[in-house]
Amino acid sequence: SALTCSGSLSFEEGLELVLIRARAMQNACKDNNSTMAAILFLSDEEINTTCEDIENVVPANYNCPGQIVISGSKEGIENACVVFKEKGGKTIPLPVGGGFHSPYMKSARVELEDAVNKAKVDTPSAPIYQNYDAIGYTDTDKIRSNLINQLTSPVRWTQSVNNMIENNVKNFIECGPGRVLQGLVKKINRETNVSSL
């Protein structure tokens, strides 16, 4: 949606890429027995270090301080939840079809790459912060590669918001139903102004 709103992708091309990405991710879920869980009340560092010690589990979403989602094999996630509870965290298994934003989406990445490379991507009217590295870009080659890379890499929402704030963004507007992102932004930095459309 950011690429479409900034004039980088046409609305039609944006919808087509969303559809291709969704189908590719759904197909990837059939190839592996993976899932996700939210981990609350532990630091990013503790979760990262613990995931390194658990087979087939990786951080998948850095939502806000004290809230990270992990992806992995079903067995790996079950084991991780036990370990994180022992460390004082709260674990919430998520009702999802697979281990998104992780290496479990490798086959989806291959499917999406061809479509992204064929898409007409123009220079956006403002820097686009993508999940892959949380840095704002206007370079179309970087935007393309990040669209592909973010399928198998964690969502760096906390880092994206912090980087936007460092670049003098003061107002955050959530587009679409719900207020989840507004809540996350406030948990990252209470000084932000948040609203929704």
Name each model-derived stretch.
Residues 1-6, 182:
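Short helix immediately C-terminal to the catalytic nucleophile in hydrolase catalytic domains
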Residues 117-197:
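Acyltransferase/transacylase module recognition
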Residues 4-152:
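Alpha/beta catalytic cores of group-transfer enzymes, especially the acyltransferase/condensing modules
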